[in-house]
C-alpha cells in the first residue's frame, strides 16, 4: 500500500489537531460541574457517560494524521486507567497542554531533544514533591471522600467505604447490575465459591432451599466419589461424634450419592456434597486454598493419599457453612493463621509475577477469599443507559479508592499540581532544558483552569489565586470558593495524580521529538466504483427487452 509522508512543522501540526480534538471532547467532563458526552452505538441506545477512558476508546478520526495524534493521547488515558484506574481526563489535559506549549517552542527553533530532558527533569521533581505532600488514608471517612469525589456521588462514596471496611483493602469488591432501582451493598463473609449442593434432598432449610451446617467436618478431595465404601470409615467416626459433614469432591454419584441422601432423609446424619470449584490446575489450587482455610488436607493421589485411608485428622473444620443450589460459603474456617498468611503471601507473589490479565484476576479473587471475603455493589437505575453510566462511575470510584489506600491522597481539584510549582524553581536546567521545565510548569496549571472553566469561572484568574494561597488551599468547584481541600474532603489519590503526570510527560516528549509522520494513502479501490457505473449504460440493451 502506498504511503504519504509529512515532515517537521506540517507533521506536528496535523498530529496536534488530533490531540486537540480528542482532548477537547474529554475536557468538558472534568470536575463536579463537568458535562456528559453521548456516544453513538451501532447496536442499542446511545451511551451517555463522563468517564474519560470510555470516551477516548470510542474516538477514531477520519483523517489519518489527526487520528494518529488522537491515538497517542488515547494511550495516555488508557495507560493511566490501567495503572491507577482513574484520572484519565486529567492525564489527557496535561498531555494536551504540554504538546501545545512544546510545539510552539519547537516551531520557534528550540531543540526538541533538549526540551525532552527538561520535561523529564520537571516531571521527576514534581512527582517527588507530590510524594512529600501525600497523606496516608486510614479511616473510613477518608475512603468515603475519595470515592465520593471520583463518582461525584456521596452515597456511592459511603457504599464503597462500607464495603472496604467489611472486606478489608485486599478483599474483592465487585460491581454488578441490580434488578431493582436501588443501589445496594451485599457482603459475603468468608470464602464463597460457585458450586452448590449435588442434590436438593440435602437441604436443611426447605423454605429457602439452603443447607446450613454448624461446625461441620469438611472432606476435600479431587477424586469422584462413587463407592460409599471408600468414605464409610471416616463417615462412621464423624457420626459417632454427632457432627455434620461437607464433602467437596470432583463429583458425587451413583451408590455414594443415594446412600448419603437416604441417610439424610432418615435423619441418621447430615451430609451435604458439593462439586469442587474451578477446572484443571486452578481446581487443585482452589481446593488447596479451602484446605488451608479450614485446617484440612486435600486427599489426592498427587500427594499419595487415598479416600479409603482418609482419617478424621485430615478433615477441615469451619464455624458455619451455607450451601445454596449455586454457591457454597465457608465462614470462619479453623485453619492455622500462620498457614493462611503464608498462602496469602504466596498468592501475592504470583499476582506480581503473572503477565496474564485473566490469571491475575483469578488470583486476586482467590486472595480476597482467603484474606477477607467478597463485597458486591449492586447498581440500580431506572433505565439501562443510566445504569451503565452509573456503573462506570462506581468502578472508577472503586479504582480511585484502592489507589488512595495504596499511595495516599493529595489535595484535589488540581490543587496538588499547583502546589508543586515552587519546587520546579529548584530544577537545575538552562537553555532549551529550562524551556522543557517551563512547559511542565504551564501544563500543571491546566487542570485547575479547566475545572474553573467547567464551573463557569475564569480559569486564568482562579489559577493565579490558587498559586498565591497556601499549600492545599484550592478552588472548590462545587461551592465556587477557595478552601483547604483536605479539610473539605476534596481529595485525589496520589497514585492517580502521579500516573497522569508521568504518562502525559512521556507522550509529550515523544510528540515533540517527532520529525516525520507516515500514513496510508486512501485505497485506490474507492475510485473503482465510477468505472462500474460507466459500464451500466452498456446494459441498456436490456431496455430493448420489450422489443424482443
UniProtKB/Swiss-Prot annotation:
Key words, A-Z: ATP-binding, Chaperone, Cytoplasm, Isomerase, Nucleotide-binding
Cystine bridges: none
Compositional bias segments (type: Gly residues): 532-548
Catalytic activity annotation: ATP + H2O + a folded polypeptide = ADP + phosphate + an unfolded polypeptide
Biased composition (Acidic residues): 522-531
GO biological process terms on file: protein refolding
Chain spans, region Disordered: 522-548
Subunit structure: Forms a cylinder of 14 subunits composed of two heptameric rings stacked back-to-back. Interacts with the co-chaperonin GroES.
Entry similarity comment: Belongs to the chaperonin (HSP60) family.
Function: Together with its co-chaperonin GroES, plays an essential role in assisting protein folding. The GroEL-GroES system forms a nano-cage that allows encapsulation of the non-native substrate proteins and provides a physical environment optimized to promote and accelerate protein folding.
UniProt-recorded name of the protein: Chaperonin GroEL
Encoding gene (name): groEL
